[in-house]
Curated annotation (Swiss-Prot):
Region (Disordered): 66-92
Gene this chain is encoded by: sgk1
Domain Protein kinase as annotated: residue spans: 100-357
Superkingdom, natural source: Eukaryota
Keywords linked to the UniProt accession: Apoptosis, ATP-binding, Cytoplasm, Endoplasmic reticulum, Kinase, Nucleotide-binding, Nucleus, Phosphoprotein, Serine/threonine-protein kinase, Stress response, Transferase
Annotated localization: Cytoplasm; Nucleus; Endoplasmic reticulum
General function of this protein: Protein kinase that may play an important role in cellular stress response. May be involved in the regulation of processes such as cell survival, neuronal excitability and renal sodium excretion.
GO biological process: apoptotic process; inflammatory response; intracellular signal transduction; neuron projection morphogenesis
Domain named AGC-kinase C-terminal: residues: 358-433
Bias type Polar residues, positions: 83-92
Taxonomic source organism: Danio rerio (Zebrafish)
Name the record gives this protein: Serine/threonine-protein kinase Sgk1
C-alpha cells in the first residue's frame, strides 16, 4: 500500500472542496474494506515510510505472549496426520451437496463462497457457506472455523444472530447451512446512503448491542464487528453473522491477546497487543455507530500509518450535528482506556441503560415488536437486489455441488478430512430441516 500525504489545494468553493475530499476518502475506504488484516499488516510493513513511524514500529515489533493464538500470515503446508487435532465429537449427518440446487453466489471470503441454495426435498431456501479445507489448513485457520461452528450452535435462539441449521463436510469442503438473509449488508446500505439519521442508527445499534450482550452472556467475545458482518433481514431487522473470529470461554473478568480483527475497527489495546476483554466489542459498536452517523469510521485515514496513530493517540472528534446523548455514548464507547470504557464495569447493562437508548423498549426490541426504520421490501427469496452484483454476477462453480471422485482423493485431502473431525452437525430428527 502506498502511503501518501494529501496536499492542500485551494478551491473557490469550500463546500465543494470538502465534499470532494469526503468522496475521495469514501472511495479509498471502499477499496480497502475487503483487505484482510494480514494483508493490511503485510503491506504496511513493506512500506519504508510507514515503518519509520514510531507507532507502526511498536505495532509491528511487539512480541506477544507465547500462548497467544496469532493469525499466521505466512502460508505453511498442511500439518501431518500426527499433528491433527480432534476438534470435537459429532453425529454423522446424512446431508450432502447433491441435496441442494445452488442458485447464486451471494458472498465471498478468504476460504470460499456463500451461495443461495434451495433444498431439493422441501424447496426451502438457505445460505450455504462453502469453505475449501486446503485453504483453511494452509493458513492454519481450522480452530477459527471450528470456533465459528461452535458459536453458531449456541446462537439459534437469539433474534439478531444468524442461525445454523446443520453443517456437513466432503473430502475437500466444509458446508454451513445457514438462515438465508436477503435484506443486504449494512455496509451495502451505508454505501448507497452514506449515513443514517439518528433514530435509524439508534435502532440498529440497539439490536447489535442486544446480540453482543447475548454472546457475552455465553462468555463469547465477537471481536470483528463491522458493517459487512451485519445483515438486514427481509423486514429490516439486524442479523449478526460471521463468527470466525469469536473467542469462546472468556469469563466476565477474563482477557485474551489474539491480534485479529479489521484494521479500521481495532481497539487501541488490540493494536498495542495488550490483553483485552469484552470491551473490544463495545469499542467496535462505537465505531460502527459513528460510521452510521458520519459515513466513515472514527479514526479513518487514507494514510495507514496515520490511521493507526489516530486510533492510538488522536482525541475523538465529534461534529455538532448529533444529539448530546449520541455524543455522550460515542465518547463512552470510544474511550481509549478500556478500564474507563462504557461497558467495562457492567457490560451490556451499562449500554442499554444509557440515555441514548431511552426511547428503546428492550423487551419489545428483542421480541421484534418494534417497527424497523427501513424496510428492504424484498419480494421473496429470489429477490437479490440488495446483494452486490460483484457476487451475484459470478457463475456458481460446478464443484460446489459435488465431491472429488474417490479415485482422485489425494493424501492432502485425506489430511484435510482428519483435521475437521467433529465439524459435521445434525439436529434432532424432529427439527431437521
Amino acid at each position: 500500500m502506498t502511503i501518501q500525504t494529501e496536499t492542500s489545494v485551494s478551491a473557490p468553493d469550500l463546500t465543494y472542496s470538502k465534499t470532494r475530499g469526503l468522496v475521495a476518502n469514501l472511495s479509498a475506504f471502499m477499496k480497502q474494506r475487503k483487505m484482510g488484516l494480514n494483508d493490511f499488516i503485510q503491506k504496511l510493513s513493506a512500506n519504508s515510510y510507514a515503518c519509520k513511524h514510531p507507532e507502526v514500529q511498536s505495532i509491528l515489533n511487539l512480541t506477544p505472549p507465547q500462548d497467544v493464538e496469532l493469525m499466521n500470515s505466512n502460508p505453511s503446508p498442511p500439518p501431518s496426520p500426527s499433528q491433527q487435532i480432534n476438534l470435537g465429537p459429532s453425529s454423522n449427518p446424512t446431508a450432502k451437496p447433491s441435496d441442494f440446487d445452488f442458485l447464486k453466489v451471494i458472498g465471498k471470503g478468504s476460504f470460499g463462497k456463500v451461495l443461495l441454495a434451495r433444498h431439493r426435498s422441501d424447496e426451502k431456501f438457505y445460505a450455504v457457506k462453502v469453505l475449501q479445507k486446503k485453504a483453511i489448513l494452509k493458513k492454519k485457520e481450522e480452530k477459527h472455523i471450528m470456533s465459528e461452528r461452535n458459536v453458531l450452535l449456541k446462537n439459534v435462539k437469539h433474534p439478531f444472530l444468524v442461525g445454523l441449521h446443520y453443517s456437513f463436510q466432503t473430502t475437500d469442503k466444509l458446508y454451513f447451512v445457514l438462515d438465508y438473509i436477503n435484506g443486504g449488508e449494512l455496509f451495502y446500505h451505508l454505501q448507497r446512503e452514506r449515513c443514517f439519521l439518528e433514530p435509524r442508527a439508534r435502532f440498529y445499534a440497539a439490536e447489535i448491542a442486544s446480540a453482543l450482550g447475548y454472546l457475552h452472556s455465553l462468555n463469547i467475545v465477537y471481536r470483528d464487528l463491522k458493517p459487512e458482518n451485519i445483515l438486514l433481514d427481509s423486514q429490516g431487522h439486524i442479523i449478526l453473522t460471521d463468527f470466525g473470529l469469536c473467542k469462546e470461554n472468556i469469563e466476565p473478568n477474563g482477557t485474551t491477546s489474539t491480534f485479529c480483527g479489521t484494521p479500521e475497527y481495532l481497539a487501541p489495546e488490540v493494536l498495542h497487543k495488550q490483553p483485552y476483554d469484552r470491551t473490544v466489542d463495545w469499542w467496535c459498536l462505537g465505531a460502527v455507530l459513528y460510521e452510521m452517523l458520519y459515513g466513515l469510521p472514527p479514526f479513518y485515514s487514507r494514510n495507514t500509518a496515520e490511521m493507526y496513530d489516530n486510533i492510538l493517540n488522536k482525541p475523538l472528534q465529534l461534529k455538532p450535528n448529533i444529539s448530546n446523548a449520541a455524543r455522550h455514548l460515542l465518547e463512552g464507547l470510544l474511550q481509549k482506556d478500556r478500564t474507563k470504557r462504557l461497558g467495562f464495569t457492567d457490560d451490556f447493562t451499562e449500554i442499554k441503560n444509557h440515555m441514548f437508548f431511552s426511547p428503546i423498549n428492550w423487551d419489545d426490541l428483542n421480541a421484534k415488536k418494534l417497527t424497523p426504520p427501513f424496510n428492504p421490501n424484498v419480494t421473496g427469496p429470489n429477490d437479490l437486489r440488495h446483494f452486490d452484483p460483484e457476487f451475484t454476477d459470478e457463475p456458481v462453480p460446478n464443484s460446489i455441488g459435488c465431491s472429488p471422485d474417490s479415485a482422485l482423493v489425494t493424501s492432502s485431502i485425506t489430511e484435510a478430512t482428519e483435521a475437521f473431525l467433529g465439524f459435521s452437525y445434525a439436529p434432532a430428527m424432529d427439527s431437521y430441516l
